[in-house]
Amino acid sequence: MEAKNKKAVASRLCCLCNLRRPVLKRPKTLQQICRECFYEVFEEEIHQVIVQNRLFKSGERVAIGASGGKDSTVLAYVLSELNRRHNYGLDLFLLSIDEGITGYRDDSLETVKRNEVQYGLPLKIVSYKDLYGWTMDEIVKMIGLKNNCTFCGVFRRQALDRGAALLKVEKLVTGHNADDIAETVLLNILRGDIARLSRCTSITTGEDGPIPRCKPFKYTYEKEIVMYAYFKKLDYFSTECIYSPNAYRGFAREFIKDLERIRPRAILDIIKSGEDFRIATTTKMPEQGTCERCGYISSQKWCKACVLLEGLNRGLPKMGIGRPRGVNGDHNKETKKPGSVAKSIESKQCGSLDF
């Protein structure tokens, strides 16, 4: 009887330290662990991802894409801690994009401003209005809710690069987690997008562009990020974008979550499948050049952002929606060689913000 009681007590202890009571079951390992051990394994796994993939070099300036949400807030906190603990030697900055969404982004930016003080990281905010002459509120007013995520996604990606160029950083890190990457793999399969499928699982992208982007959370589950933020009592903004409930990605997200309930490792399995995909030798990949209008990296005469802006400014918001076909149907135009893309981004003008 006594042995049975001891076994019962042991089963209620953390499976790693056998000292404290567990507070959660890890989604990808199903281990029941205590809070202290969770902090340790969570941070150590991210450190190992950084080291094994050689994401940074000592002395580099690194911008953290900060939205105020759970992912970027936890990323900023953990990267700051690891930078000090393991002496990465990085100069870290927060980079936020103001899309101009009243009642959403203005509130989340207040969270980022608090994070700036809490973590002691300099903050740079770049707005769509300054870059493109439009806010997302104005764009949605013109085009409606359909396709608004296309505009925002294109503009946001370029805005992050332009903000990073202003900060003169060598790397840009984002809080994309394992769930996000699994969703992207699934979406690219459903769309038949071979080009994007070939690179969406890469932990570092854009190495041929102005500023490489890294994803330290590539193998980190969203659930664990939420739990880490909760236990650490981190200050983050949890409201969903008011324009995104009907986004196509949302359906993929729900499907992934259903799979995870049945098989917890489904997320990592999907990422592994994406990594194992190989591009057929007959598939011709578009050659990267630079946009004639703004100098941003592009495989067409004009980059996607400039095509979308041209449509907005001409009252033709559907221009540029869908697969890239070049400007005015001229998709076979010869593109400029990349050369010094970073220099082009800083020296060309986009909207009213001069780079």
From Swiss-Prot:
Classification via CDD domains: CTU1-like (cd01713)
GO biological process: protein urmylation; tRNA thio-modification; tRNA wobble uridine modification
Region (Disordered), start-end ranges: 320-341
Keyword line: Cytoplasm, RNA-binding, Transferase, tRNA processing, tRNA-binding
Keyword check for tRNA processing: yes
Entry's localization field: Cytoplasm
UniProt function note: Plays a central role in 2-thiolation of mcm(5)S(2)U at tRNA wobble positions of tRNA(Lys), tRNA(Glu) and tRNA(Gln). Directly binds tRNAs and probably acts by catalyzing adenylation of tRNAs, an intermediate required for 2-thiolation. It is unclear whether it acts as a sulfurtransferase that transfers sulfur from thiocarboxylated URM1 onto the uridine of tRNAs at wobble position.
Membership in a protein family: Belongs to the TtcA family. CTU1/NCS6/ATPBD3 subfamily.
Entry protein name: Cytoplasmic tRNA 2-thiolation protein 1
The organism of origin for this protein: Arabidopsis thaliana (Mouse-ear cress)
Gene (UniProt): NCS6
